[in-house]
């Protein structure tokens, strides 16, 4: 995986204490990549109550206030040797505007702060972060609230339970992206698989074996596959983690216990059920304090 060349950071300028600013600056500095910061502002309905002339003045004044602030942030980054450009604009369709920026820029990473949404709201509306995970053509780096600006511990979360060629290719991409991030940030690289063996699946296997015997056999096969994958990419033994449990809860517990800064995960193709319920990567956003890099 080559070194980063261009990074795109999307921010809401109303959230001026966003950790995403520091994360993007730190990764850009470490990698030598250029950084473009797009401050996209959702349309303010209250401005529609003003007369047209007053509305134009208010919109221009509002944008200028945020431009001045962002210019100050950019100058501080430039003082640290970071190549940075900025823009402030209204966003009538946030998802599409972000994707348009990605299409135009072709960045190596799209960086954005995790936007937490209440469970009830997620039941009726697909969160913006989920939509970006599903439709963004480049890796999406969603910054959590509690991790080092420059990652110190990166974990590649793979799935060795699916033997389809497409999943094997995804595992490779996950590890390569995690390796690239860890290398450029001088961070530790860990490899993890959360082994979750559903009883319903085992019950269908038959063969005269007991459930516990089937569990042991399947676990042994999965661990062998995991160790082969780790060996192929040269992951040291002390950085290999074969853990048991549901992926969301197991990853969350591991991230807390080991103070992980970034979890690198894959994005899958969605059927109707997955679109409704959300994937492991989408749900983990709300369970861990660290950042997620989805590839």
What is each stretch, according to the model?
Residues 1-3, 16, 75-110, 117, ...:
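Structural beta-alpha unit
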Residues 2-55, 153-208, 216, 232-235:
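Small/aliphatic-rich secondary-structure junction motif
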Residues 36-38, 85-89, 141, 190-192, ...:
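General small-molecule cofactor/ligand-binding pocket signal
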Residues 55-68, 210-224:
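A short acidic, glycine-rich active-site loop
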Residues 111-114, 139-145, 293-295:
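Short beta-strand elements of ligand-binding domains
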Residues 112-131, 262-287:
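Glycine-rich, Arg-bearing micro-motifs that act as flexible, cationic patches
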Residues 127-148:
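Short, structured interface segments
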């Amino acid at each position: 995986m080559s070194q980063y060349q261009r990074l795109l950071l999307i921010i809401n300028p109303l959230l001026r204490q966003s950790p995403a600013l520091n994360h993007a600056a730190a990764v850009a500095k470490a990698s030598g990549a250029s950084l473009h910061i797009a401050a996209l502002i959702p349309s303010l309905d209250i401005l529609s109550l003003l007369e047209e002339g007053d509305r134009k003045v208010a919109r221009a004044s509002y944008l200028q206030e945020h431009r001045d602030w962002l210019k100050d942030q950019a100058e501080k980054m430039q003082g640290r040797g970071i190549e940075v450009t900025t823009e402030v604009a209204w966003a009538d369709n946030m998802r599409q505007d972000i994707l348009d920026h990605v299409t135009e820029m072709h960045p190596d990473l799209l960086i954005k702060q995790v936007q937490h949404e209440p469970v009830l709201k997620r039941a009726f509306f697909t969160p913006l972060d989920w939509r970006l995970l599903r439709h963004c053509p480049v890796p999406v780096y969603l910054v959590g609230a509690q991790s080092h600006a420059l990652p110190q511990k990166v974990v590649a979360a793979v799935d060795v339970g699916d033997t389809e060629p497409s999943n094997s290719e995804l595992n490779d991409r996950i590890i390569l992206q995690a390796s690239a991030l860890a290398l450029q940030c001088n961070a530790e690289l860990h490899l993890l698989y959360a082994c979750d063996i559903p009883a319903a699946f085992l019950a269908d296997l038959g063969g005269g074996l007991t459930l516990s015997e089937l569990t042991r056999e399947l676990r042994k096969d999965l661990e062998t596959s995991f160790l082969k994958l780790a060996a192929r990419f040269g992951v040291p033994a002390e950085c290999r983690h074969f853990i048991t449990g549901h992926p969301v809860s197991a990853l969350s517990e591991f991230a807390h216990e080991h103070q992980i800064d970034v979890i690198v995960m894959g994005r899958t193709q969605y059927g109707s059920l997955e679109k409704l319920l959300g994937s492991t990567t989408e749900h983990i956003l709300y369970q861990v304090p660290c950042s997620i890099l989805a590839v």
